[in-house]
Every structure is written in structure tokens, then in C-alpha cells.
Design a protein with these regions (language model features):
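Adenylate-forming
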Residues: 200-244, 254-263
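ATP-dependent adenylate-forming carboxylate-activation enzymes
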Residues: 178-193, 364-366
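Conserved AMP-binding/adenylate-forming
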Residues: 230, 239-334
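Short hydrophobic/charged patches on amphipathic alpha-helices used for structural packing
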Residues: 137, 189-192, 221, 369
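Conserved AMP-binding loop of ANL adenylate-forming enzymes
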Residues: 137-172
Length: 455
């Protein structure tokens, strides 16, 4: 595979100095997996040296041998970092402990995602932003999106990078972009009108909002399959198989999943084979580890996803960041093309926090969602774990929206029977008007489909 230009390692320039890196040719890819391995070896050392500058890491890395960072046994001695550690600090404390860049190098801030806990605002230098744009933009050619496409982006356009950084990255890859924004800013009816007017071929947004848009279109007598959208790109929440199939059926479109986070960037995307998410391993050093021991797991085993950004680390040099995702690592795709040849994949299992315990019974969120979206008459739902005021016992309440031709009584009976048989818990079912849940979900970066409001 031919490299682009005269820069080494597939266009990713070597370190200019200990603080900044040269910006690469954005469309250049490494020439081989061997080349990526050499690049990872070099960049691990840069990441490690930058982390040693952060006050939080003082005393935590002294036992690590820098000359042995490529040895998994040595690398695994580095402590794993997670969001709970960050939430102990207010913003000023976080900046003191983790930020190693001077104020005059900070270009912008990226807000953390998530539906629980206090958000964290990560400083990003001009170099971080440049590499971040590459990480988001790579998703377009990986998914077969090019200059012949127009994307309608329905993520929030603001301090969270999923909207504005992704939209900006499209310009680098010569992909058309309609900067629409989330449904709480541009109402669903207006978004459908824009799709009808501008004729985008790609819809980018949370899977929950894409479902809501299709349901809203049906309520207005519009067949979403007859619209111009041919691909749907989902992010910010786990895409279950049932939800993917429902989106494909409602829109008549091919659905793609991607994977990323504010702590690092967009780390990968599916290709046309849809057999996993290809991870840009020249930009990110990734591990799937045993959550108890922190040791790397063999291919195919489910464990905790950890990432060390190799380039977006000029301000916050995180090592072995625990994203809270349960995934498996797969070396090869059944697909073809440079992304399949160069980059390994991950496959989602579920989030580590992805279960309710209802009176001693574990209810897995992903499995529950699969069952819910597999029911024909249900268009959307929210599961609420609450406390019964009369008995002081916990109970599960389902708020559901139903399609035309489906009665609330029929759904109540069907859901109660399904949940009891499949998950061995009883539920209360509330049918809410169409659009109720989407209006609530639009206020969050990630749809709060499972909510714990116990007293």
C-alpha cells in the first residue's frame, strides 16, 4: 500500500518536540499493520512522557521501565484511569491535576458524554483538534461516504464534539454536511422538512432519535423509506441488533455504527461488512482487559475497553483510560479494502453499568432493549427503576409509545407477560403519547432510556 507524501509512517509525522506534533496529511493511511506497530511503539513513549508531566501521575509511574513499554507485562503495571477518578475534582482541580498544556495552546473544550454523573470538560490544544478532526473524518471513507453524499447531522452542535467536530471533519474529506443539530434545537418536523428539501443521503444521529424521526414521519403520513436517506450513522449509545433492524426496516437504509469518546476522539467505524467496528490503531492504543486484574485478554473474549490516545494527548495525557464499555477484540474483518486490511475491530457486549437489579434479579439493558424493539407495535420506550411509596419496594415501570393500530391494553398485556417470562420481574406499563419520549431524550447527549430514580 502506497504511503502519501514524504512524511514517515503513513503521513503521521514524528514528534516535533516534547510538547507538540506535526499535523499529518489527513487522507494518508499507514502502509501496513507492521508499520502501525512501529508507530505505536514510538507513540507509547511520547504518551508516557507526557503523562509524567501531569501532577495526578506523580508517584504512580515511577516503577515503570520506559525501555519496556512494548512489553504487555510492563504496560499493564500502569494504573487504569476511569471517570470516577476525574469526578473527584471540580474543573479547576481537574485542570491542575491533568492539564499539561499552557493556556495559550488551548483551542477548545470537549464535554464528556454520558447520562449520569457530573460532566467533565477536557481542554484540547490546536494539535489535539487537528488530530481529532482526522479521527472523526476517517469514518466517512470507512463507511463508503464520499463527495457524492450529503450528510444531515442531528447531533448537538455545541461543546460536545460528536456534533461540531464531526461536521467540521467532513470538509477535510470533501463530504457535504448539513449542520442541523439536535431535536431540542431543530424540532423533528423541521428536520423532516429539511430532509425532504435538501435530499441528504446520510442521516447522522443517535439511534433513538432516528427511530423517533421515522415514527414522526409515519404519523404525518410520510414514508421514511421514500425519502432520500440511504445510510444512517449512529453513535452516542449502544446500537442493539433489534434497534438496527428496526431502523433498517423503517428507513429502508443501511445502518452503520461508530465508536468514540470525548476523552480520545472517534476511534473507529464499521465498514460494509458490519462485522465489527474498525479501530484506528495508529491513532489510539487499545486494550481489552480483565476488569478484575487489568490484564489484556485474548482475541474474542469480552472485557473492559481501555484506550491510550497516541496523538490527542497534548493537553490531557491519559494512559489506559477505562471507557466503561464491555467489548471483544477481533483481529480481522470479513470485509475488504484498506480499513479492513489495516485495522482490527471491537464488538460491543454491553455497558458495565448496563443492568438494573430489581428485587435481586439482574435485568441486562441490552437484552431488554432487544426484546422491546422486537415487539412490532412498540415504537419507543423508557424503563424506570423506582421505589413504590406504599411498600418501599423497588419496581420497574415501562413508559412506551405505540404505533397506529396498536391498543394500550394489548401492549400492556403483551409486555407484562414478556417481561415476566423473559426476565422474571413484574412491570407497570404506562402508554404515553407519540413523541413524548423523544422530546425528553433530545435534552440529553445520550438518550436516558434506562433511568434509576429510586428514593
Amino acid at each position: 500500500m502506497k504511503r502519501d507524501g514524504n512524511t514517515p509512517l503513513g503521513g503521521l509525522n514524528r514528534t516535533k518536540d516534547r510538547h507538540t506534533d506535526m499535523v499529518p496529511n489527513v487522507k494518508s493511511l499507514p502502509g501496513s499493520r507492521r508499520e502501525i506497530a512501529a508507530l505505536q511503539s514510538e507513540r507509547r513513549r511520547v504518551a508516557f512522557e507526557r503523562a509524567r508531566q501531569a501532577p495526578w501521575y506523580r508517584g504512580k509511574l515511577d516503577h515503570i521501565r520506559v525501555d519496556r513499554l512494548d512489553d504487555p507485562e510492563e504496560w499493564q503495571k500502569i494504573p487504569i484511569l476511569d471517570k470516577d477518578a476525574l469526578r473527584r475534582f471540580d474543573h479547576a482541580g481537574f485542570m491542575r491535576e491533568f492539564c499539561v498544556a499552557p493556556r495559550n495552546r488551548i483551542a477548545e473544550y470537549w464535554r464528556s458524554g454520558g447520562t449520569t454523573g457530573k460532566p467533565v470538560f477536557y481542554p484540547r490544544t490546536y494539535e489535539d483538534v487537528a488530530f481529532g478532526l482526522i479521527s472523526w473524518g476517517r469514518s466517512f471513507p470507512c463507511m463508503g461516504i464520499d463527495a457524492n453524499d450529503l450528510c444531515h447531522i442531528a447531533f448537538p452542535i455545541g461543546v460536545h464534539p460528536a456534533g461540531q467536530v464531526w461536521a467540521r471533519s467532513a470538509q477535510l474529506y470533501e463530504v457535504g454536511m448539513a449542520w442541523v443539530g439536535a431535536g431540542n434545537v431543530v424540532p423533528t418536523a423541521a428536520q423532516l422538512e429539511l430532509i425532504d428539501t435538501l435530499k441528504p443521503t446520510v442521516l447522522m444521529g443517535m439511534s433513538s432519535f432516528a427511530l423517533h424521526m421515522a415514527n414522526s414521519a409515519e404519523a404525518r403520513g410520510i414514508d421514511a423509506c421514500a425519502l432520500s436517506v440511504r445510510k444512517i450513522v449512529c453513535s452516542a449509545e449502544v446500537l442493539s441488533n433489534a434497534k438496527r433492524q428496526k431502523l433498517e426496516r423503517l428507513w429502508g437504509a443501511e445502518v452503520y455504527d461508530v465508536f468514540g469518546m470525548s476523552e480520545a476522539g472517534l476511534m473507529g467505524a464499521e465498514n460494509a461488512a458490519h462485522d465489527g467496528i474498525h479501530i484506528w490503531t495508529d491513532l489510539f492504543d487499545v486494550e481489552v482487559v480483565d476488569p478484575e486484574t487489568g490484564r489484556r485478554l485474548p482475541e474474542g473474549e469480552v472485557g473492559t475497553f481501555c484506550v491510550t490516545p497516541l496523538w490527542t494527548n497534548h493537553a490531557t495525557p491519559f494512559l489506559r483510560w477505562n471507557s466503561g464499555d464491555q467489548v471483544s477484540y477481533i483481529e480481522r474483518s470479513s470485509g475488504s479494502g484498506p480499513y479492513a486490511e489495516l485495522f482490527p475491530m471491537i464488538r460491543h457486549a454491553n455497558r458495565t453499568t448496563g443492568f438494573f437489579k430489581v428485587r435481586g434479579v439482574n435485568v441486562n439493558h441490552t437484552e431488554f432493549e432487544d426484546e422491546m424493539f422486537g415487539i412490532e407495535g412498540i415504537t419507543d420506550f423508557q424503563a424506570v427503576l423506582e421505589t413504590d411509596a406504599a411498600t418501599d419496594l423497588e419496581r420497574l415501570r415501562l413508559r412506551v409509545e405505540v404505533g397506529r393500530g396498536t391498543t394500550a391494553d394489548a401492549v400492556d398485556a403483551q409486555l407484562s407477560a414478556m417481561v415476566k417470562a423473559r426476565f422474571e420481574v413484574s412491570v407497570l406499563v404506562d402508554t404515553v403519547p407519540p413523541g413524548t419520549l423523544a422530546a425528553e431524550f433530545e435534552k440529553s447527549i445520550k438518550a436516558p432510556r434506562f433511568v434509576d430514580v429510586r428514593a
